[in-house]
């Protein structure tokens, strides 16, 4: 029997980038599995002046620290600019990307090829979430919360609490 775990040398450091607006149970599933493959996983929150996230950067970082930051070998960070430059600065040899469905693949594949062109020393590793999270996205979670739905099955408790406050009806 072939033991696959011994066939792959442990890469030292990987980056799992995203906007995490907000972090979902699907994100946490990818983080949990990625941390078993690498010595360190840096969960990197992208700061993009062109986008208007629901949650400010500091709040996204705080929620990630509360939910994933306590995991062994996981570090929460932020970055602005090119991901491969951040990876180079952090001496990371891999970028982790989650693929929920075939529809994610085309975009992620193009990004992986572009990142390889920019820096051939950074590999992209695709991980699929557990089946129960394949439909889950931050966008869908925000829409459910905005419409008054219960998101507690899709996000950690701290995130559900934050979203319920964010979308609470105002009593004017």
Residue spans for each PLM region:
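Nucleotidyltransferase catalytic core that binds NTPs
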Residues: 2-172
């Amino acid at each position: 029997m072939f033991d696959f775990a011994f066939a792959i040398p442990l890469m030292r450091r990987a980056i799992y980038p995203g906007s995490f607006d907000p972090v979902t149970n699907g994100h946490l599933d990818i983080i949990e599995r990625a941390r078993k493959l690498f010595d360190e996983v840096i969960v990197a929150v992208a700061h993009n002046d062109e986008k208007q996230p629901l949650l400010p950067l500091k709040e996204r970082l705080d929620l990630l620290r509360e939910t994933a930051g306590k995991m062994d070998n996981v570090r929460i960070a932020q970055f602005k600019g090119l991901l491969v430059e951040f990876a180079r600065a952090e001496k990371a040899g891999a970028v982790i990307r989650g693929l929920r469905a075939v529809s994610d693949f085309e975009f992620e594949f193009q990004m992986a090829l572009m990142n390889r062109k920019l820096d051939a020393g950074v590999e992209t590793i695709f991980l699929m979430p557990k089946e129960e999270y394949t439909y889950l996205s931050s966008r869908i979670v925000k829409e459910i919360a905005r419409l008054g739905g219960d998101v507690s099955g899709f996000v950690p408790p701290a995130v559900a609490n934050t979203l319920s406050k964010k979308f609470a009806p105002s009593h004017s």
